[in-house]
């Protein structure tokens, strides 16, 4: 199975303060899923694997070699899953890698780091700048400047240039994600 998602947004921001900003935002994602099957001791087992990629590119980004890499990754994952065993239960250390685990991080704490929730005092992070909010070694960034990544933009929807924002550094809360309104109300710069 394969899925292709593509969009091409052209954005113009015209603010009341006279700011004019524009951005072109292509976005593509190709996903490949395979199902592998094996019979072991008379028991049929089926497992899935997936591969894919994309970013802020046009459709020409995908070539035959890249497509083959995605298929190979999906096949490898499915075959690896055929050999898997149930995960142990209980409390354990979890290590998140780069990429899609960032969505888990975003949902778990990202919304709580938004300026409006903190200004209103409805976030667990409200009033905690400068305090330890995560384990030592944990750094969380909001970085819209990483070239060609899904979350990368030249300007945000308010016409502000994208930037690299350190939210948590070595476990210490450094700041919040700020739109223009909440930044002004909190006396800080928009992020």
Where are these regions (language model features)?
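Active-site bordering "gate/hinge" segments
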Residues: 1-164, 169-172
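C-terminal, non-catalytic macromolecule-binding modules
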Residues: 170-191
């Amino acid at each position: 199975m394969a899925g292709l998602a593509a969009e091409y947004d052209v954005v113009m921001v015209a603010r009341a303060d006279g700011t004019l900003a524009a951005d072109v935002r292509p976005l593509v994602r190709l996903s490949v899923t395979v199902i592998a099957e094996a019979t072991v001791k008379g028991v049929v087992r089926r497992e899935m694997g997936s591969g894919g990629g994309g970013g802020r590119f046009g459709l020409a980004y995908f070539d035959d070699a890249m497509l083959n890499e995605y298929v190979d990754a999906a096949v490898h994952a499915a075959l690896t899953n055929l050999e898997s065993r149930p995960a142990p239960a209980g409390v354990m250390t979890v290590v998140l890698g780069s990429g899609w685990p960032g969505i888990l991080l975003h949902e778990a704490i990202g919304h709580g780091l938004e300026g409006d929730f903190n200004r209103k005092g409805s976030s667990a992070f409200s009033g905690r700048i400068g305090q330890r909010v995560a384990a030592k070694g944990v750094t969380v960034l909001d970085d819209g400047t990483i070239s060609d990544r899904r979350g990368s933009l030249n300007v945000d929807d308010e016409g502000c240039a994208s930037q690299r924002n350190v939210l948590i550094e070595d476990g210490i809360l450094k700041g919040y994600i700020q739109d223009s309104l909440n930044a002004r109300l909190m006396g800080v710069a928009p992020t």
